[in-house]
Amino acid sequence: MPVHLFDIIPDARRSMLRITMRGHWITETVEEYRVAVARAVATLIENGCKRERIVALVDAREVSAQSQDVIEEYQKNMVRDGRVPRRLATLLSSALFKRQVERIAMPNQRIFSHEHEALAWLLSSDDDA
């Protein structure tokens, strides 16, 4: 049975994307992910969410350290599409992967070990990212 390398669940009530990443990606996975994120954002907007208010919770605790090609493709896609959420909380457990994420982190991104802390930051009314 193939492993699903990511799941994306739009939560219109919170203007939030809940994303789970797992495993080792290839550059084609990054493109599949980009398309899935675009669909999920469109779903939120269709349900009344404003693009500039969308936040994202990315659970990357089950993802492996990625190749440089995958990291570069991921970063390029995020910048190219302009689909940067208002806030991006990333859940990590691996110190090695944390260093990779920190290298490509966006200004509005924070890294967390605990989901409750990530959600509190994402959903706070404070507009400072």
Task: Give the label of every model feature segment.
Residues 1-129:
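Amphipathic, Lys/Arg-enriched alpha-helical "gate/interface" segment within cytosolic domains
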